[in-house]
């Protein structure tokens, strides 16, 4: 984590985009100084910048059993924000496992970091573990972009990822809350969610989401369903009408006006117009007797 932190914040790299400003090397060295202490669990709070919103209870239980057998090999990382109050920077799963074991204290490395640094380290630490859901990962990318005023391309370079990877994840954040919740709960996959993006219409997106869950549609079936909906939504093309010459329009209007005059005189005139490729046909019926 130290290498990641150094790379992101410019420690030892003056050219880094993330270099901390107006700090001496002594101040930087002080920040990364590690001090391990046994801290009461009741004095520790989760990281407010934690991108992970879903913790697998079964995996926490497995981790707790491992810690019970082998001990906590890697201490959690915290920062002090008040007297005897600490916030987790990294290691919330280990913290939860220790709590489950009933420990009163937990070994912790104390770092002196500000809010921006704490958020960045927490986000990067979780991103590198590759255990986040697609939505949690997207939220982490968005927070890093906002914290450091980065473009998607710049963030991709810093994280060693493709720009398209970042862009595809961020698009998920535009989906309705119900779909994002389904992703978090793993009711649908990331590919299902991405397939819903072209629909645009939220009502349609939620309708297809319901179909995916209820009918257990795979990604291919989902894409086919969405393609059909998009096709149905396209405006129907009107049959191309052939251009009608001005003289023809005048002739047709003259006939219609004449028929109206006859009808106005009291005669019951019936007429029917038909259009063919090469001509118009008007059939007129005038009764012999009034």
Swiss-Prot record:
Entry keyword annotation includes Acyltransferase: no
Keywords: Cell cycle, Cell division, Cytoplasm, DNA-binding, Septation
Localization: Cytoplasm, Nucleoid
Keyword Cell division included in the entry's annotation: yes
Protein name in the entry: Nucleoid occlusion protein
Matching PANTHER family: CHROMOSOME-PARTITIONING PROTEIN PARB-RELATED, NUCLEOID OCCLUSION PROTEIN
Gene3D superfamilies: 1.10.10.2830, 3.90.1530.30
N-terminal signal peptide: none
An individual GO BP term: division septum assembly
Family named by the database record: Belongs to the ParB family.
Top-level lineage group: Bacteria
DNA bind region: 153-172
GO molecular function, one term: DNA binding
Task performed by this protein: Effects nucleoid occlusion by binding relatively nonspecifically to DNA and preventing the assembly of the division machinery in the vicinity of the nucleoid, especially under conditions that disturb the cell cycle. It helps to coordinate cell division and chromosome segregation by preventing the formation of the Z ring through the nucleoid, which would cause chromosome breakage.
Organism phylogeny: Bacteria, Bacillati, Bacillota, Bacilli, Bacillales
């Amino acid at each position: 984590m130290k290498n990641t932190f150094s790379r992101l914040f410019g420690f030892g790299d003056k050219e880094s985009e993330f270099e901390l400003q107006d700090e001496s090397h002594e101040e930087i060295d002080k920040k990364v100084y590690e001090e391990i202490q046994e801290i009461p669990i009741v004095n520790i709070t989760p990281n407010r910048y934690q991108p992970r919103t879903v913790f697998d209870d079964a995996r926490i239980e497995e981790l707790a059993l491992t810690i019970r057998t082998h001990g906590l090999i890697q201490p959690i990382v915290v920062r002090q924000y008040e007297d005897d109050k600490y916030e987790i920077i990294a290691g919330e799963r280990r913290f939860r496992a220790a709590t489950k074991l009933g420990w009163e204290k937990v070994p912790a490395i104390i770092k002196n970091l500000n809010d921006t640094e704490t958020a960045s380290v927490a986000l990067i630490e979780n991103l590198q573990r590759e255990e986040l859901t697609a939505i949690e990962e997207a939220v982490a990318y968005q927070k890093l972009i906002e914290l450091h005023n980065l473009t998607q391309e710049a963030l991709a370079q810093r994280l060693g990822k493709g720009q398209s990877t970042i862009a595809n994840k961020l698009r998920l954040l535009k989906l309705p809350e119900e779909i994002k919740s389904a992703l978090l709960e793993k009711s649908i996959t990331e590919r299902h969610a991405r397939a819903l993006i072209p629909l645009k219409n939220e009502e349609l997106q939620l309708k297809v989401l319901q179909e995916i869950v209820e009918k257990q549609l795979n990604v291919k079936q989902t894409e086919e369903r969405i393609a059909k909906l998009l096709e149905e939504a396209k405006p129907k093309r009107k049959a191309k009408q052939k251009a009608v010459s001005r003289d023809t329009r005048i002739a047709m209007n003259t006939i219609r006006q004449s028929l109206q005059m006859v009808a106005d005189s009291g005669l019951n005139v019936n007429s029917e117009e038909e259009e063919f490729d090469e001509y118009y046909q008007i059939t007129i019926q005038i009764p012999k007797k009034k």
